[in-house]
Curated annotation (Swiss-Prot):
GO cellular component, one term: cytosol
Protein name: Glutaredoxin 3
Family listed: Belongs to the glutaredoxin family.
Gene Ontology terms describing biological process: cell redox homeostasis; cellular response to oxidative stress; deoxyribonucleotide biosynthetic process
Annotated function: The disulfide bond functions as an electron carrier in the glutathione-dependent synthesis of deoxyribonucleotides by the enzyme ribonucleotide reductase. In addition, it is also involved in reducing some disulfide bonds in a coupled system with glutathione reductase.
Entries under PROSITE patterns matching the protein: GLUTAREDOXIN_1, GLUTAREDOXIN_2
Domain (Glutaredoxin) ranges: 2-83
Alphabetized SUPFAM superfamilies for the sequence: Thioredoxin-like
Length: 83
């Protein structure tokens, strides 16, 4: 199974949607909350080049945000990455 990491904020609806999609596929993921954690937020920005959440990584490959995750799934590209 792939190593999935997702940077989140507690009140972010897109974070909840992304986690719901991953959970619906039976995927375990490491949630990395950035709420009140400046160091974790800086780590996310350095890794992804983006300041918005969620930011999703599968086996250290940057996938992007929630819309990127859903688009990847719609193209049939998500499931192969999760194996």
């Amino acid at each position: 199974m792939a190593n999935v990491e997702i940077y989140t904020k507690e009140t972010c609806p897109y974070c909840h949607r992304a986690k719901a999609l991953l959970s619906s596929k039976g995927v375990s993921f490491q949630e990395l909350p950035i709420d009140g954690n400046a160091a974790k937020r800086e780590e996310m920005i350095k890794r992804s080049g983006r300041t918005t959440v969620p930011q999703i990584f599968i086996d250290a490959q940057h996938i992007g945000g929630c819309d990127d995750l859903y688009a990847l799934d719609a193209r049939g590209g998500l499931d192969p990455l999760l194996k």
